[in-house]
């Protein structure tokens, strides 16, 4: 019994129960920020008003009067759409539709273009498809429809149409279709291939840790009392408990992240996301640590939203032995508020099955909210809140609730460096009062991570990456759980 309690205390004093949260959050944050930066800017929206007087059409700085007849209005409407003069196009459209026998293919095309300019992509898609039904093989209309499909993340349909357009453009008359259009189409086709390709990163390098065993380097003494022959309380003996000296070590630090989405039809698809990270120390193998987290399931993408629901699996090793396996479920929703702002909600629950320490078996449920804002000059701010409930069979020293705040700032510098600063603050309250500590444990943990990527020194596809992390934990059970830790690593990273 005493040995079991001692092992349990030793185990619970190790930070692996919650210390890798920042690494996992940082890797996910990097993937999500990449998605945000890849989003295309929407067309500028404007208020459309009608007028009885026909505005003059402006082309290449010259103004042309438009007469009130169907021929003039049809030409002016088409040219206004192609010149992206949306207010004028709307006026021409209104007047043109008053004439009997107007060209429905033209008006549907114009209405689709105006709808696209306002961000109404579903309506734009319907109008372009209607126009093509009346006038099949209209290359300009096909091109606009393909763009709308691309912007709505309907990757499979967009790719099919763009490839067809590519073939037509190669055989078209440059006098009718400018050669620059083919260049644009080629660029979008490449973007579609990248969007549906495997993306991620892998990095490895050396790391130095100043307090590998997360020791407080403190001790505490208790006085045990008993009663004498007369029944009075007297001190019997003193018991001192303490933590070992902090150990430093040099080892291998490695990380990998991977995402892949398979478009099935329309907005629907299947997505995979996998993370792997850990550290290995030659002279301190008992502190080796690694984690693999995989989730794959249903994915919905459109212009403004990305939704995913999937099962997940996580495997963690500690000291070269399997620590636990976990199965669970994950749901996420990322909303692109505008071209420079995004918001994400995540929730997951996993059933932890420890291979040796069965009293730690339980369910961990968590929820995260994150906001991104891109500023001029390639500054990006992100921040978030998180809550977590970690329940275990052992209710006194391992089960807890946690609330956290995250703040971060990243910047791409013109000198060929990228920097990211991430800080997290967590408040952890354990479930019950523990007689062992004569306290109900509560911790305040803070982590500060600074990452410098050096693309200017890239060679053979490898980018140098320097990461510094400071971890501070303050506990009311100070002698056992309070500690400071510094970690610095230098890795080579390959992104694909």
UniProtKB/Swiss-Prot annotation:
Instruction: Give Gene Ontology CC terms.
Output: cell outer membrane
Q: Mainly localized where? A: membrane
Residue ranges crossing the lipid bilayer per the database entry:
198-208, 253-263, 268-277, 291-301, 305-315, 327-337, 341-351, 365-374, 380-389, 403-413, 418-427, 446-455, 462-472, 486-495
Pfam families, per database record: SlipAM (PF04575), TPR_Slam (PF24575)
Gene that produces this protein: hsmA
- InterPro entries reported for this sequence: Slam_C_b-barrel (IPR007655), TPR-like_helical_dom_sf (IPR011990)
Instruction: List the membrane topology term(s).
Output: Multi-pass membrane protein
**Superkingdom per UniProt:** Bacteria
Using the record, list the residue span of the signal peptide; answer none if the entry has no such feature: 1-19
- What is the official name of this protein in its record? Hemophilin secretion modulator
What family is reported?
A: Belongs to the Slam family.
- What keywords appear on the UniProt entry? Cell outer membrane, Membrane, Signal, Transmembrane, Transmembrane beta strand, Virulence
The effect of disrupting this gene, in the record's words, is:
Knockout of the gene abrogates HphA secretion. In a mouse pulmonary infection model, the mutant shows a small decrease in bacterial lung burden and systemic spread.
Give the induction note.
Answer: Part of the hemO gene cluster.
What does it do?
Part of a high affinity heme acquisition system. Mediates the secretion of the hemophilin HphA across the outer membrane into the extracellular environment. Plays a supporting role for full virulence.
């Amino acid at each position: 019994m005493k040995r079991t309690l001692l092992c349990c205390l030793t185990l619970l004093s190790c930070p692996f129960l919650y210390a890798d949260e920042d690494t996992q959050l940082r890797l996910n944050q990097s993937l999500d920020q990449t998605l945000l930066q890849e989003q295309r800017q929407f067309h500028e929206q404007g208020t459309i008003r009608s007028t009885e007087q026909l505005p003059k059409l402006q082309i290449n700085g010259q103004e042309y009067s438009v007469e009130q007849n169907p021929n003039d209005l049809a030409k002016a409407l088409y040219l206004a759409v192609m010149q992206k003069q949306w207010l004028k196009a709307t006026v021409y459209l209104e007047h043109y539709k008053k004439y009997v026998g107007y060209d429905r293919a033209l008006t549907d095309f114009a209405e689709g273009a105006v709808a696209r300019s306002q961000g109404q992509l579903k309506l734009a898609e319907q109008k372009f498809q209607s126009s093509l039904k009346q006038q099949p093989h209209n290359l300009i209309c096909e091109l606009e429809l393909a763009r709308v499909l691309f912007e709505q993340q309907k990757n499979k349909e967009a790719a099919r149409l763009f490839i067809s357009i590519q073939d037509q453009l190669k055989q078209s008359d440059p006098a009718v279709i400018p050669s620059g259009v083919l260049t644009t189409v080629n660029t979008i086709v490449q973007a579609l291939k990248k969007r549906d390709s495997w993306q991620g990163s892998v990095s490895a390098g050396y790391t130095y840790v100043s307090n590998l065993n997360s020791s407080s380097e403190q001790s505490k003494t208790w006085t045990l009392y008993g009663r004498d022959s007369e029944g009075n309380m007297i001190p019997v003996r003193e018991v001192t408990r303490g933590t070992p000296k902090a150990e430093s070590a040099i080892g291998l630090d490695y990380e990998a992240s991977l995402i892949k989405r398979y478009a099935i039809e329309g907005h629907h698809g299947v997505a995979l996301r996998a993370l792997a990270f850990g550290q290995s120390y030659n002279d301190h193998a008992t502190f080796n640590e690694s984690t693999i987290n995989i989730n794959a399931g249903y994915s919905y993408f459109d212009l403004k939203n990305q939704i995913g629901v999937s099962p997940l699996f996580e495997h963690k090793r500690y000291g070269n032995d399997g620590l636990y396996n976990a199965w669970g479920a994950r749901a996420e929703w990322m909303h692109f508020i505008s071209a420079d702002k995004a918001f994400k909600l995540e929730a997951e629950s996993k059933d932890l099955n420890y291979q040796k320490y069965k009293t730690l078996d339980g369910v961990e449920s968590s929820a995260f909210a994150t906001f991104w804002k891109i500023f001029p000059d390639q500054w990006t701010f992100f921040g978030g809140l998180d809550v977590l409930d970690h329940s275990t069979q052992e209710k006194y020293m391992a089960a807890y609730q946690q609330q956290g705040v995250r703040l971060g700032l990243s910047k791409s510098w013109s000198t060929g460096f990228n920097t990211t600063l991430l800080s997290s603050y967590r408040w952890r309250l354990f479930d019950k009062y523990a007689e062992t500590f004569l306290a109900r444990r509560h911790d305040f943990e803070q982590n500060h991570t600074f990452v410098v990527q050096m693309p200017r020194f890239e060679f053979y596809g490898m980018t140098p990456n320097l990461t510094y992390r400071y971890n501070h934990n303050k506990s009311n059970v100070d002698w056992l759980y309070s500690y400071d830790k510094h970690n610095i690593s230098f890795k080579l990273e390959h992104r694909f």
